[in-house]
Amino acid sequence: MQSQESGVHYSRWDSSSRDEVSMTAMSSSEEASCYRRISQKLCSGKLGIAMKVLGGVALFWIIFILGYITGYYVHKCK
């Protein structure tokens, strides 16, 4: 099975006066394949490990700041 790419293909026949123009579009399964390829690149190998570490550090700081703000207002002296 051949994968089809989006685009226009123009073919001119020498033996007759017919010209052939064919147009193809990317199917949804090929779009999913593109997203899967990007996901595979970002989530595996050294880049994937770096992304997970950065995501974990960012999540830690978000939770830390939310906890700090919440604790400030809960334990605020009246």
Curated annotation (Swiss-Prot):
Q: Which residues carry this modification: Phosphoserine?
A: S6, S17, S22, S27
**Record key words, sorted:** Acetylation, Cell membrane, Disulfide bond, Membrane, Phosphoprotein, Signal-anchor, Transmembrane, Transmembrane helix
* Quaternary structure note: Homooligomer; disulfide-linked.
Family named by the database record? Belongs to the SMIM1 family.
Membrane topology per the entry is: Single-pass type II membrane protein
Which domain of life does the UniProt lineage start with? Eukaryota
Tagged with keyword Nucleus: no
Q: Where is the composition biased (Basic and acidic residues)?
A: 11-21
Membrane side Cytoplasmic: residue ranges: 1-48
Q: Does the keyword field hold RNA-binding?
A: no
Name the job this protein performs: Regulator of red blood cell formation.
**What is the protein name given in its UniProt record?**
Small integral membrane protein 1
Write out the GO MF terms: protein homodimerization activity
Chain positions covered by the region annotation Disordered: 1-22
Q: Supply one GO CC term from the record.
A: plasma membrane
Q: Where are the transmembrane segments?
A: 49-69
Where does it live in the cell?
Cell membrane
Q: Which residues lie on this side of the membrane: Extracellular?
A: 70-78
Q: Name one Pfam family in it.
A: DUF4731
| InterPro entries (UniProt xref) | SMIM1 (IPR031744)
Name the gene: Smim1
For the modification N-acetylmethionine, the affected residues are M1
